Structures are given as structure tokens and as C-alpha cells.
From Swiss-Prot:
This is PHD finger protein 23A. Acts as a negative regulator of autophagy. GO terms for cellular component: cytoplasm; nucleus. PANTHER family: HISTONE-LYSINE N-METHYLTRANSFERASE SET-26-RELATED, PHD FINGER PROTEIN 23. The lineage of its organism: Eukaryota, Metazoa, Chordata, Craniata, Vertebrata. The gene is phf23a. Residues 50-80 are annotated as: Disordered. It comes from the Eukaryota. Belongs to the PHF23 family.
Length: 296
């Protein structure tokens, strides 16, 4: 029994004599702050801090022992120190970000030469834009004037055609009138031929004026019956042969077979599409009807 006890005591002594493994120190807030500052300086957010002096109250082992042995007061002081360290870290990070942003802005700012180039480009662009605007305005004016001119040309062409048709019909009627009337065979033939020549020349003048001056076609070259009457100036336009008492005035007429009097188609109630070959005025019809009754 004594031998066993001695052996047990020897083992206990050996265990005590052997060096115990050192206990791992617990991490504190200061260690965390140091780690954060190291990471920030490594990333370039914070400028590298100067090496601290060899002795500092935070790095001395006495302070660690005192902090471990002290009570609540020391814990409160460490918390306040840690908060102040965190505030300092945040301030440093903010300053680093502002410095980096300002440096980027300054790096993006152009130099004096580039500013001169930019002003020259702006001025050239302004000049080009003005020239382009002028061109666009001219094109718009031309495009707006084009259809107007085409419309005016079409109107003038139609009006000239209508005037020529009226002139031709009047000339035909006058020729027919002069060939069939026995009273004015010599003198009126010359007048009517001169009138036809004048009317033809007037029509040609109208066409030439309408082709040369397209801008004033809508206002100056509107041809109507009254204009033709004024331009002609001959006595044949004022001849009154119809029973209505109105002059010839270039309107279509028809001749009676018996009395050779010219009557307007509108007064005789005859359409232009249904003109008869033989026509008797209402006076001749009445006289013929009375003679037929007398014979019976």
C-alpha cells in the first residue's frame, strides 16, 4: 500500500512539475480596433499611422493585469475608449473617401488646352447648327411654295382653257352670224374678222402672262365673262338681236330659218347637247300657225 501511495505522489509531483500549456488570451475591443485599422490601411482608405512608442499604457502588461483585476469602472473606461476609437476610425474612413473622390474629380478635370479645344468645338457646332437651320428653313419655304405654285399653275391653265373655249365659240357664232345675215355682208365681215384676230391675240397674251408670272396667277389672271367683254371693245359684243333685249356677249346663239334673227339658246330653251338643225323662233312659229289656220 505504501508503495502504491508513493507511486501516486510521484506522478502528481511530475504533473505539477511539468509546464502547463499557456492559456490563450481573450480578444478585447482594442484588438478588434487594431485589426480594423490594419485592414483599412492595407486597403488604402487610411494613411499608414506612425509606429507607436515602445511603451504605451495600452501595450504594457501592467495595464492588462490591472484591467483584468479591476472591476466595473475599468470596463466602463475601456468601452468609452473603444467608442472613441471607433469614432476616430469612421472619421478617417470618411476623410479617405472624400480625398479619393476629390482626387478623381481633379483627375477628370480637363486642362487649359482641352478647355480651349472644347470651346472651339462648341463654337463650330453652334455655327454648323445655324447653317443647318437656315438650310432647313429654305427647304421648308421651297417645299411650301412648290405645291402653291403647282396649284396656281393648274388654276391658270384651266382658266386659260376656259377663256380660249369661250373665244372659239364666240368666233364660230360670229362667223355663222355673218355668213347667214344678208344685211351686213360687206362691212360687218371685216369687223368680225378683226374682232376674231383681237380675241385670239388677247388669249395668247393671257397665256404668256400666266406662264411668266405664276406668283400673281391667283389674283391677276382670273378670266371671267365681264373681263372678256371689257378687253374686246368691239361693237359685236353689244349687238342685241335676241327678244330678251340682252347683248350677244359671247354666249351661244341660234339663227331662225325664216327671219334670220339670232336667239340665245337659253332664251329658246335649247340645250347645247341638243341643238336642232332647223330652228324657228316663236314669232315665226306663230305666224306660220296663223297662215295654216287661214288656209284651212
Amino acid at each position: 500500500m505504501l508503495g502504491i501511495m508513493d507511486h501516486h505522489q510521484d506522478t502528481v509531483r511530475k504533473c505539477k512539475s511539468e509546464a502547463l500549456p499557456p492559456e490563450r488570451r481573450k480578444r478585447t475591443v482594442e484588438d478588434f480596433n487594431k485589426f480594423c485599422s490594419f485592414v483599412l490601411t492595407y486597403a488604402g482608405y487610411i494613411p499608414p499611422q506612425k509606429e507607436e512608442s515602445s511603451w504605451s499604457p495600452s501595450s504594457s502588461p501592467c495595464t492588462h493585469d490591472l484591467s483584468e483585476l479591476s472591476g466595473e469602472g475599468s470596463v466602463k473606461d475601456s468601452w468609452t475608449d473603444s467608442h472613441s476609437d471607433l469614432n476616430n476610425i469612421h472619421n478617417l474612413v470618411y476623410k479617405a473617401e472624400t480625398d479619393s473622390s476629390s482626387s478623381r474629380e481633379f483627375s477628370h478635370l480637363p486642362s487649359d488646352n482641352s478647355l480651349d479645344k472644347m470651346t472651339l468645338k462648341d463654337s463650330l457646332n453652334h455655327v454648323h447648327s445655324k447653317a443647318e437651320r437656315k438650310k432647313v428653313k429654305k427647304l421648308d419655304r421651297l417645299s411650301l411654295g412648290g405645291p402653291r405654285k403647282s396649284i396656281s399653275e393648274a388654276r391658270a391653265h384651266k382658266q386659260s382653257k376656259a377663256a380660249l373655249k369661250k373665244i372659239k365659240t364666240s368666233i364660230k357664232a360670229e362667223r355663222h352670224f355673218t355668213s347667214s345675215s344678208p344685211l351686213n355682208e360687206g362691212f360687218e365681215k371685216e369687223e368680225l374678222t378683226e374682232q376674231a384676230i383681237h380675241m385670239h391675240e388677247a388669249g395668247l397674251k393671257l397665256e404668256s402672262n400666266q406662264e411668266t408670272d405664276l406668283s400673281s396667277c391667283e389674283t391677276d389672271t382670273l378670266v371671267t365673262d365681264e373681263d372678256i367683254m371689257v378687253e374686246s371693245g368691239d361693237d359685236s359684243w353689244d349687238l342685241i338681236t335676241c327678244y330678251c333685249g340682252k347683248p350677244f356677249a359671247g354666249r351661244p346663239m341660234i339663227e331662225c330659218e325664216e327671219c334670220s334673227i339670232w336667239v340665245h339658246l337659253s332664251c329658246a330653251k335649247i340645250k347645247k347637247s341638243n341643238v336642232p338643225d332647223i330652228f324657228y323662233c316663236y314669232r315665226c312659229l306663230d305666224s306660220r300657225g296663223s297662215t295654216v289656220k287661214r288656209d284651212h
